[in-house]
């Protein structure tokens, strides 16, 4: 809200130097922008989420969801610096209170823990995180639901559970059809389970090519680690 207000106000002032008519159009948006600014200045929680002030208040008080958000930001910051998930201090994954399933940070925290565990090779705890995510499917946005289903294909493939891998795959066909390293890695694991070595190698190569487009060095390192394990299988 605050950023929107400042942008509209600045544009209105600048256009006034050149055109009164154009400036009038932008000045018309200032009251609504000011309303958003004031709305976000109050620590309220609405159906669409928390206002900026409510989030800030939670951070100051180290409330569960806000603490999880700050820790997630720290994790992604370190991923950008080149650390992989398992190389980041585990306190950012686990030094958190229990969150309710309908809290968005609940799913994000479990997703980060899953990646931490799977990179370390702790497949039991990784599977537990995925299963808990699947159990909270009703609260997940579609994109995250698809990603969870795709990672379930990966886990079931590693466990040689063809039936469950195929069931999970039916829930995320479009996601697995994407030209991403994650999708190719999951399909490669599925082919490895079926003994389709040549298809697995081809998909691994495609995944490695996709990684050239990955901007986050830590995620690139993570995917390379998982791909290397497929070669060992």
Predicted regions and their residues:
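Hydrophobic transmembrane alpha-helices and their immediate loop junctions
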Residues: 1-233
């Amino acid at each position: 809200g605050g950023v929107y207000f400042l942008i509209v106000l600045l544009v209105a002032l600048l256009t006034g130097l050149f055109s009164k008519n154009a400036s009038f159009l932008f000045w018309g948006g200032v009251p609504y922008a000011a309303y958003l600014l004031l709305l976000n200045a109050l620590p309220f929680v609405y159906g669409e989420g928390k206002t900026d002030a409510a989030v800030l208040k939670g951070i100051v008080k180290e409330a569960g969801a806000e603490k999880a958000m700050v820790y997630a930001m720290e994790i992604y910051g370190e991923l950008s610096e080149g650390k992989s998930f398992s190389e980041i201090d585990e306190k950012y994954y686990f030094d958190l209170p229990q969150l309710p399933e309908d809290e968005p940070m609940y799913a994000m925290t479990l997703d980060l823990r899953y990646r931490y565990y799977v990179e370390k090779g702790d497949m039991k705890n990784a599977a537990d995180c995925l299963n808990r995510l699947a159990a909270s499917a009703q609260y997940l946005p579609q994109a995250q639901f698809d990603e969870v289903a795709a990672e379930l294909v990966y886990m079931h493939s590693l466990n040689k559970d063809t039936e469950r891998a195929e069931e999970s795959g039916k829930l995320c066909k479009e996601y697995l059809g994407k030209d991403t390293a994650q999708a190719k890695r999951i399909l490669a694991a599925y082919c490895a389970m079926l003994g389709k070595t040549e298809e697995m190698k081809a998909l691994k190569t495609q995944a490695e090519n996709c990684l050239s487009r990955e901007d986050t060095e830590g995620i690139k390192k993570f995917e390379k680690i998982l791909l290397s394990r497929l070669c060992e299988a």
